Structures are given as C-alpha cells and as structure tokens.
C-alpha cells in the first residue's frame, strides 16, 4: 500500500510549546496521524529536536523549520513507498538527514513521520497499533510508574530528585493497578492539604509542594499509601528518578543547585552510599538515573552495590541508543533502560533498543516526556514490545490520561489473554 501524501504541521504540547504533528495519507484513503513530545531535562547524547530560534515567535521554540523539512524534503522522498516497509522508510529519512544526532532535519521531524507511518499501516489493516508493531505475541500490560511528587527541573520544589513514583506491583491487572494509583494520588492530595502545602501539579501531573527534602517526600508517599488502605512493599513500591546529571558537576553531585544551603555535596561513592541507604530504609525498588550520564564508574559501583535488589534504570545514560546501551551492558552499568521515542528519533531505532535490552536480560520502561500531547502511541509501544512497565505521568492532566485510557482499552481487548507487569513475562 503506497504513501501518497505526507503533511507536517505545528501544534502545541501540554506546556504550550510548539511541537510537530504529521499525517501520512495512503492511496486507499486511510490516514495515520502522530505527534511528537519534548523533554525538560535532556541527556546530552539525545537526538536533537529542531527549533526555529526566532525569539519573536514562541520565544524561539517554533518548529516551522522542522515542518518545512517534512513537507519539502521528507515527503517527496517517501511518495509511492510501501507503508509496511517501516525499517526501509526510517532508513531513508536517516540517510536524508545524514547526521548522528538528526540535527539536519530534526529528530522531531523524523520521529513524527516514523510514528505516523506505523499508524497509517495499522489503520489500513484495521488492526490495533500495538498488534501491528508487535505481532501476535503481545500480551503484557505494563506496570504504571506514576509520578506523584515532582522535584528537580519539573517543579519549583526545593528537592533535587526529579520524580517520586508509585508502582502498584501487587495489582492483578492494569485496571486494578491504575485504580490503586488514583486512590493513593487523592490520598496524597489530602495529606499535603492537611499540612497546608500546595496541591498544584507540575508538568507531569504530580504535586510540587514545598517539602523539607527527599525523606519528607518519601514519608508523605508512604502515609498516602497507608491512608489509601494499601501496604508498602506488598501492594505498592516507590520508584525514584534522581535525574542526577542535572546536578552533577566536576565529579560532585551538588544538591545545592535545587535544595539551596540545606543541600549536600556528594562524591560518587557518597552518592552510591546515600542511594543504598534510602533503599534500605524505604520501599524503593526502582531508581532511574541514580548516577550522572558522565559518571560511568559511578554507575558500575551503584550496579554492583544494589543492582541485585533494585531496578536501576538508565535514561540519560543510554538515551534509547543501542550504542550507549551496548556499552552499558558490556561494563555492567544499570539493569534496565528507559525508552523515549524522541530521544532516538525513529520507531525502528526505538524497537532495536528494546530488543537489545531484553536479549541482555535488561528490563525496559517505555516513557513519556514532560511535554506531551494527546497522542497515545507509547501505550501501544509498551504493549507491543512486552515491556511490562510504563512511565506516563501522574493521575491528572488529560495528556497523561490519554495513555492510561488507551491501556485500559487494550487490556479490555486482550481479555483473559492479558498479563500484568514485566515479571509476568519472565514467569511465562
């Protein structure tokens, strides 16, 4: 089935910043549509999104250059291409760009087209996107990692760590896990309200109160879990996204960047010991970016110290790139990869990263970005790849709910064939 038209346009994301939406038209009349997210904290090795830089328009964040690249360069190259040749189409776009970071055409331009192509193919076949991408062996619904307290670059709270998440590991289904998360979210809102703290939400829908520090955030979450009628560890665990690259400089993890004078300054060894101490004290079973993307020795030390009992997720470390993931696997750094489609910039490369991780017995976590749209593609990717885990924000904001609601639909469609969580894959 041939592609007859590709149209790129500028739309707005959940932060009111411009982003890209793409329509791919087929000769049959079917259309695939996709839009592209963007991040607030980014790894230095991520594929580059193309912004206009015109300060007179959207404060320089416009994406008309990337849209033009879609309409004038990518579109002509894809006309009459077979829509089912996803890898070939992505290869054509990568060749047109010709850079390792996709800086010529823009990773946002390439990704928008790549995802829209897959959607168009699924629409033509009249099958769900997760089924088109993953085939017949797709049955794992992901454990949601719900960001309910924001810190770091995602809020103005004086906490260095970027995300405090709950993980409903004790649920029997995605639907139940989502309900558990919602109930804890509302219980936490009451905990914060009763303390006279703000219940305003950040970019990803989590609360951003002026807490005293990391342990205050953890204690507040545990109280909310208890108040909601659940048991820490057995029903719900806690995940952290330290986003350590954001406050790592000259070999030091400088918490004062976000926490002011009360913040500590830690060496790599001290950072490992601090995280190990938190794990021993609280029901934490997942830590993302506990060490900086530039601290590979620190990552090896952390993995050696607690990698046998905690999921250690590489985000900035791996940037969804098989080259960095391969290095991590060889050096024994982390045991899981965070998967962000716009970090690498094409569906093919995203799937390659997940496959490499799973073959090395690394877990994978499919993830949103802080700047999102109503597009729910990552929900389908999580199921398509049997990832078993998804990060798509808190339990508020419609841009986050779009992904959760899509997962509810998928679970309903799979019926009794559905399994819940990444551990289900390893047990089957």
Swiss-Prot record:
One Gene Ontology cellular component annotation held by this UniProt entry: cell surface
NCBIfam families: eno
Annotated positions binding (2R)-2-phosphoglycerate: 162, 340, 369-370, 391
Cofactor(s), by name: Mg(2+)
Positions contributing to Mg(2+) binding: 241, 288, 315
Gene encoding the protein: eno
Subcellular location: Cytoplasm; Secreted; Cell surface
Name this polypeptide is given: Enolase
The enzyme's E.C. designation: 4.2.1.11
Protein source organism: Azobacteroides pseudotrichonymphae genomovar. CFP2
One GO process term, biological-process aspect: glycolytic process
């Amino acid at each position: 089935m041939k592609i007859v038209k590709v149209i790129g346009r500028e739309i707005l994301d959940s932060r009111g910043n411009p982003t890209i939406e793409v329509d791919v038209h087929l000769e049959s009349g079917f259309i695939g549509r996709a839009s592209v997210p963007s991040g607030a904290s980014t790894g230095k090795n991520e594929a580059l999104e193309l912004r206009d830089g015109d300060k007179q328009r959207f404060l320089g964040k416009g994406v008309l250059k990337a849209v033009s690249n879609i309409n004038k360069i990518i579109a002509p190259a894809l006309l009459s291409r077979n829509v089912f040749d996803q890898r070939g189409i992505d290869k054509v776009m990568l060749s047109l760009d010709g850079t390792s970071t996709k800086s010529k055409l823009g990773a946002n331009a390439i990704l928008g087209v790549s995802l829209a192509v897959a959607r168009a193919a699924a629409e033509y076949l009249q099958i769900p996107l997760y089924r088109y991408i993953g085939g017949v062996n797709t049955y794992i619904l992901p454990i949601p990692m719900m960001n309910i307290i924001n810190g770091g670059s995602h809020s103005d709270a004086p906490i260095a760590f970027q995300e405090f998440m709950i993980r409903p590991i004790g649920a029997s289904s995605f639907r139940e896990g989502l309900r558990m998360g919602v109930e804890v979210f509302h219980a936490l809102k009451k905990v914060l309200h009763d303390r006279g703290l703000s219940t305003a939400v950040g970019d990803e829908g989590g609360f951003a109160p002026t807490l005293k520090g990391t342990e205050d955030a953890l204690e507040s979450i545990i109280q909310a879990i208890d108040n909601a009628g659940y048991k820490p560890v057995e029903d719900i665990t806690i995940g952290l996204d330290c986003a350590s690259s954001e406050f790592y400089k000259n070999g030091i993890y400088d918490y004062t960047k976000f926490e002011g004078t009360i913040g500590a300054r830690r060496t790599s060894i001290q950072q490992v010991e601090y995280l190990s101490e938190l794990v021993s004290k609280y029901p934490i079973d997942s830590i993302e970016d506990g060490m900086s993307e530039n601290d590979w020795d620190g990552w090896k030390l952390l993995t050696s110290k607690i990698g046998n009992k905690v999921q250690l997720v590489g985000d900035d470390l791996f940037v969804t790139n098989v080259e960095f993931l391969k290095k991590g696997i060889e050096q024994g750094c982390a045991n899981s990869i965070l998967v962000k489609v716009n970090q690498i910039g094409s569906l093919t490369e995203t799937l390659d990263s997940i496959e490499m991780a799973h073959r090395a017995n690394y877990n994978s976590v499919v993830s949103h970005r802080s700047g999102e749209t109503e597009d729910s593609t990552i929900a389908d990717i999580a199921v398509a790849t049997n990832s078993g885990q998804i990060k798509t924000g808190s339990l508020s904001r419609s841009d986050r709910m779009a992904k959760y609601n899509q997962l509810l639909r998928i679970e309903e469609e799979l019926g009794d064939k559905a399994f819940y969580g990444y551990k289900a894959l390893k047990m089957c």
